[in-house]
């Protein structure tokens, strides 16, 4: 059941930021700010005294920073979801990914100066993330318990469609994705012999550090995708924030193509753009994976992947921070297999044995 209202605590060392966020998110009657604080110590104290439904926590603060406070909260096993506020710097990005490893459900970037703040924008982002998180917790479709999802009506089980060998793996994810992708990439074998193209909804300024972090945990090379570079096997390519990632053929090879055209489904990069480009270039020779995240980006394209004879996988509800995009894909009939995050690579390897490379 969604708390009504959702009781929020805001922790930031700037009084102005606390007031801005408090005023903005309470414009929605479903959210009520019950307390605010300015240090990590305040965070721990208010979490225990107020037992809020959600905490909005700044990364960088005096006395005790947000990372330390988050780590302490996790040790106390209070089970309160935390959304981090992170400045758009290299240090801020690295601290943010560490916070996600510690258990934060998501993050929202903020400018380094309060004078650059767009109060309405940051308020809308926080409201949507908070409400999407709680709404996802009351949706329990029966399919999520199945390993093999129901066949899509246009592509019945045992379809006559010719399924060609797999040439690429495409993964789309949003809220909860950084931690889930780290889990997936840590399990990819060094000799996977395929390129892996990733769209993670993430602001510009964070994706390069994120790709580096994935690379540190993976046996294959992982990098932020660059426009015009050749697509190589045993390499993961992460779409840059604020750029669509697509594929183009030239001289008998596949190449990365980035563009800054209009957002699709409210996102740039968009999972839909990547999957539709992969369908055009690889036809049925793709595995499409849709993972944790709010919204519907990629769900319609996953249906098209399955229609053309590609293989499709969704992360299950139990291991998703938000069962949103993947839920949409399942309900639309676009998903062939539903797996916990720890089993996605196992399923991919089974598909590769069945279909070849």
Curated annotation (Swiss-Prot):
Family annotation (InterPro entries): CheB-like, CheB_C, CheY-like_superfamily, Sig_transdc_resp-reg_Me-estase, Sig_transdc_resp-reg_receiver
Transmembrane as UniProt keyword: no
Domain CheB-type methylesterase: residue ranges: 162-344
Location of the active site: 174, 201, 297
CDD domains to which the protein is assigned, alphabetical: CheB_Rec, REC_CheB-like
Changes after translation: Phosphorylated by CheA. Phosphorylation of the N-terminal regulatory domain activates the methylesterase activity.
Disulfide topology: none
MF GO annotations: phosphorelay response regulator activity; protein-glutamate methylesterase activity; protein-glutamine glutaminase activity
Primary location class: cytoplasm
Domain Response regulatory: 7-125
Keywords: Chemotaxis, Cytoplasm, Hydrolase, Phosphoprotein
Reactions it catalyzes: [protein]-L-glutamate 5-O-methyl ester + H2O = L-glutamyl-[protein] + methanol + H(+); L-glutaminyl-[protein] + H2O = L-glutamyl-[protein] + NH4(+)
Subcellular localization(s) per the UniProt record: Cytoplasm
GO biological process assignments: chemotaxis
Recorded domain comment: Contains a C-terminal catalytic domain, and an N-terminal region which modulates catalytic activity.
Function of the molecule: Involved in chemotaxis. Part of a chemotaxis signal transduction system that modulates chemotaxis in response to various stimuli. Catalyzes the demethylation of specific methylglutamate residues introduced into the chemoreceptors (methyl-accepting chemotaxis proteins or MCP) by CheR. Also mediates the irreversible deamidation of specific glutamine residues to glutamic acid.
Protein name: Protein-glutamate methylesterase/protein-glutamine glutaminase 1
Lineage, top ranks: Bacteria, Pseudomonadati, Spirochaetota, Spirochaetia, Leptospirales
